[in-house]
Every structure is written in structure tokens, then in C-alpha cells.
């Protein structure tokens, strides 16, 4: 609350930078990886979702190193964060369906040649028999890329949450949700490595039908 009060003049990407600076979280991205982000034109960024809210902030920051016309598709519960709301396109992750208004916002942003960040898993990585993994990715971003002929840019965030959080996901969804915000503050004074892959042109892999 004290942080919000002393930085109420900041909005959008300026607030993202200030939050990361306040938490002393350094997003480490190589210059070579940043070159994969085009300076102009529509782009869909797809990434794993290892930690929670921090993932979105980190990718907004990463893209903003090259261009500032970026938004992230995020859980509707975060839309109340007014200083960041201009960067969000809210969806109902719990309901499993995307409202028409949100789909229109996504299409408009891409048609205006902006960058749109997706976390296709729809929720934070969970323990599985193969280790900590995202859930099966929702294919909505592929349909959007195909429809509008927008290239994809894969990103991998190299991070994880605490053992306590992972244990809570096996016991109670409510408890794990309460612990989720705590996970971001747990990462104070640390680095967050981000690896950016090569662009995938829409017509290389996907059909528009």
C-alpha cells in the first residue's frame, strides 16, 4: 500500500519497471535474444507460466526493451490493478471460455500492429509425474495467429515457485491461490532469466482454415 501511494503517478510500463526495481528483480535477457523481437508489426508472444503475476510483468518489461505497444492476456482477477490495466486484456481463466469483448480487443491490438503476450496454460505450472510443468496449452493463440497471419515468438521463463506452494496445489486450490502473490515477493533481490526463441511464421506451421 505504501508503494502504491508513493508511485500513484506511474501507469503502464513505467509502473512495471518501478515494481521490478522495487522488488530488486533483474530480468536477464541476452542482446541476441532481444534481437528476436521485431521493432514493428504484429506479434504474438507465447510463454510458460512458472511463477504467476511476475511472469507477465517480466515479459512486458522484456518486450518494452524493444517496443512499447505491448499488452498481455491475463486473468480477469488482475484487472483491478488500475495502474497496469492499460496493459491487460482480461479473460476468465476459470470459466475456460473467452468473452467476445476480449477477443475483439485481442484482434484490434494485433490489427494495429501491436504485440500480444499469451500464457497458453492459463494458470501457473503445477507438479506432475514429469516434474513441474504447465498444464496443456489452450490453442486459442494458434487460431488467432492463423486468422490474422501473425508470427509467434516462443519464450521460456527460467523460474519456479516454492515447495510450499507446490504442496498447497495438491491440497487446496484456495490455499495455493492465497500463496501465489507471496511467491512474487519471495523472489526479491534475485535474477529472472528469460530465453527468447526464434519467430515462427504463421504460414510455416498453421493453416488459416
Give each language-model segment a name:
Residues 1-46, 56-58, 65-67, 85-86:
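Membrane-anchoring hydrophobic helices of lipid-metabolizing enzymes
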Residues 44-46, 90, 117-119:
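Structural motif
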Residues 49-53, 124-125:
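Gly/Ser/Thr-rich loops at beta-strand to alpha-helix junctions
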Residues 64, 68-111:
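Conserved nucleotide-cofactor-binding alpha/beta core module
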Residues 115, 128-206:
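A cross-family acyltransferase "interaction/gating" segment
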